[in-house]
Amino acid sequence: MRGCLQLARWLSAGPKCPAASLPKAPSGLYNTIRSFTSSAQLASRARAASKPASDLETRIAQIPIDRYRNFCIVAHVDHGKSTLSDRLLELTGTIQPGSNKQVLDKLDVERERGITVKAQTCTMIYNHNGEDYLLHLVDTPGHVDFRAEVSRSYASCGGALLLVDASQGIQAQTVANFYLAFAQGLELIPVINKVDLPSAEPEKALQQMKTSFELDTENAVMVSAKTGLNVEQLLPTVVEKIPAPVGDTQKPLRMLLVDSWYDSYKGVICLVRIFDGEVRAGDQLVSFATGIKYYVGEVGIMYPTETSQTVLRAGQVGYIFFNPGMKRSQEAKIGDTYTKVGSEKAVEPLPGFEEPKAMVFVAAYPVDADHFEHLEDSINQLMLNDRSITVQKESSEALGAGFRLGFLGTLHCSVFEDRLRQEHGASIIITPPSVPVKVMWKDGREEIVTSPARFPEEDDLRSKVAEIHEPYVLATLTFPDEYLGKVIELCEANRGVQQTLEYFTSTQVILKYELPLAQLVDDFFGKLKGSTKGYATLDYEESAWQPSNIVKLQLLVNKAPVDAVARVVHYSQIERLGRKWVTKFKQHVDRQLFEVVIQAAVGRKVIARETVKPYRKDVLAKLHASDVSRRRKLLEKQKEGRKRLRAVGNVVIEQKAFQNFLAK
C-alpha cells in the first residue's frame, strides 16, 4: 500500500521527476491495478442496482399485475390522438395541465406536419376507487405508411380506444386500423372526439361505428380532447373494460424488444415489454436472435421522458440500455426475445413481428461526395427505430456514391428525408420514387428488380424474358358522393379496375379500386385531394403481382445515357414522361461550344428530343461583303470544327443541373 502512495506522489510531481529515480514497483501492484480496472464496471453496476427507490417507484412496486392496463389509441390521421394523449397525461398528473402540446410527438417532423410518425409510449398512475392502477399508453400513427408501427404497438397492448372525429365520421384508415386491432383480439372502446365543433354529428358517427364494425356503442364516450370535455370518463372505462396483461414475476425473464432509438450519450436505447420475470441493472442478458450477451446498465419507464427505476416486472413496458452498449445498431433486432444468461433452455422465444416489405424505392446521394460517410452514419442511426427501411449501396456516374433506399410508402420516404435533413443536417439528392418489378425469365427464374440499373436490356427483353409483373394494391377511398364521377375518372386514368362501390351513409361513399402501385406513388393522393377539394381519404393494402408492359425510360445526353435519371415505367407513360424530362433538363444544361442533344428513349426508340444550341462565333465579322468564296470556306471550317468537337468533346453538366432536375 505504501508503494502505491509513493508511486502516486511521484507521478503527480510531473516531468521533473527522472525516470531512473522511480522505485521498483512492489510485486503484484500491476495485477492490483488491472483487477481494479476490470472490476470498475461491475462496481458501477452494483451501485446502479443498489440505488434507493424513489417515491414513484415505491408506489409502482405496490401495484399488482392485475391492476396493470396496457392500451393504445387508434384512429385516422388528424382525428386527435396526440391531443387526447395530452389530456390523459394531465388527468393522471404525469404532466402539468396546459404546459405541453403533443408531448408524445417528439420528432420535429411530427410537430411540423401535425402527424404521428413514431409510436410513442408513456406510463401513468391512476387512482380508481381508492386503488392505484398502472396504465401504459401508446400513441400510434394513423397513416397507412406507418402500419408496421401500429401492429408492433398492438403487441404490447390489451385494448384500444377507437377514436373517430365527430365531424368527419369513419375514414379509410379508421377501417384499416379497426381490422388490424380486431385481428389482434384487442378490446375496443368507441370514442367520439371533437364533439364541441359546430359541424359535429356525434350520433351519426356512432351509427357508422355500429353498422360498419358491429361494435356495442352503449359504452361509447363523447369527448373533446381540445377542451377536455368528458375526458375524465375515459380512464374508468379503460380500467373496467381492458384486460390486465398476463405474466408471472417468478418465472425466468422473457422480454420482447418492441422498439429502439439512438442517444448520443447512452448509445442504443431499447423499448421492451416484460412478459415474465423481472430485469434489473447489473443483470446479464442474452439475445435469442444474435446470441450476444449484454450487461444491463439502466432500466426505467417513460414518464413521459426516460425515468430510471430499480426493476421492471412482468406486465410492464419500459426502456433499458446496456453497459457497455451495443457495438452495432444492427444488433437491436425489433421483435427479438431476451432472457437472463443461463435461462435460455427454460424460455420459449416470442413469435416476434412480421417484417414489413419495402414497396417504394428511391436513390439518395450526398450533395458533396466527401459527406458520404456522414450520410451513411445518419441513415444507420435513423434505421435503429425504423427497421422497415431497406438500404443498398449503389453508385452513379453522374452523382457518385449513394444508397438505394426502400420504404413502405411515399409519406414514409418524405418523412425519412425530412428527418435526415433536420436531425442530422444531411444535404442529399433524392431521385423520384419507383416500385419493384418481377422479371419472369424464360428459363423459369424469377427476379425482383428494385433498381433501373438491374432492369434487363432491350435484347434480353426480346429473347430471354417471358413476362414482367408489377405490384397492384387494393385501394379504399372514402369521400362525399358528389365527387364520385371525378374520383372514378381519376382511378380509370391511372389504370385502375373497380372492385366495389357502397354507401355507408346517405352522402358518404366507400369505393374500392385495384390500382398499380406505380400509379399510387406518382402523387395519386395529391390528385385525389385536388379532385375532391380535400375531402377524400385513402388507404391501401397489397393485392397481387400482375403481368404488365413495363419498359426502362432513359435520358440521353449526346447519345450517352444518364444513369441517375433512368426509370422503370409502364409503356403508356413514356410519351408524357419523355417530353417532360427533355423540356425540364434543357432548362438546367449550360450552352457548350457544340450542340447538345437531349433525348428520352426506350431502348433504341427515341420518344422526345430537345437541342441546346452552341455558342456562335461570328467568323465573318472581318470579311468584305463581296468575298463569297472566303465566306463559304470559313463557314465550312467552323462546321467541321463543331462536328469534330461533338465527336470527341465531353458534355460538361454541373451537378446542380441534376439537383434542379430531380427536385420536385
Curated annotation (Swiss-Prot):
Enzyme Commission no: 3.6.5.-
Top-level taxonomic group: Eukaryota
Membrane topology term: Peripheral membrane protein
Coiled coil: none
Compartment(s) of residence: Mitochondrion inner membrane
GO BP term, example: translation
GO molecular function: GTP binding; GTPase activity; mitochondrial ribosome binding
Main location: mitochondrion
UniProt-listed PROSITE patterns: G_TR_1, G_TR_2
First-tier enzyme category under EC: hydrolase
Residue stretches making up the tr-type G domain: 66-246
Keywords: GTP-binding, Hydrolase, Membrane, Mitochondrion, Mitochondrion inner membrane, Nucleotide-binding, Protein biosynthesis, Transit peptide
Transit pept. (range): 1-43
GO CC, alphabetical: mitochondrial inner membrane; mitochondrial matrix
Catalysis performed (reactions): GTP + H2O = GDP + phosphate + H(+)
Binding site residues for GTP: 75-82, 139-143, 193-196
Role noted for this protein: Promotes mitochondrial protein synthesis. May act as a fidelity factor of the translation reaction, by catalyzing a one-codon backward translocation of tRNAs on improperly translocated ribosomes. Binds to mitochondrial ribosomes in a GTP-dependent manner.
Family stated for the protein in its record: Belongs to the TRAFAC class translation factor GTPase superfamily. Classic translation factor GTPase family. LepA subfamily.
HAMAP family: LepA
Protein name (record): Translation factor guf1, mitochondrial
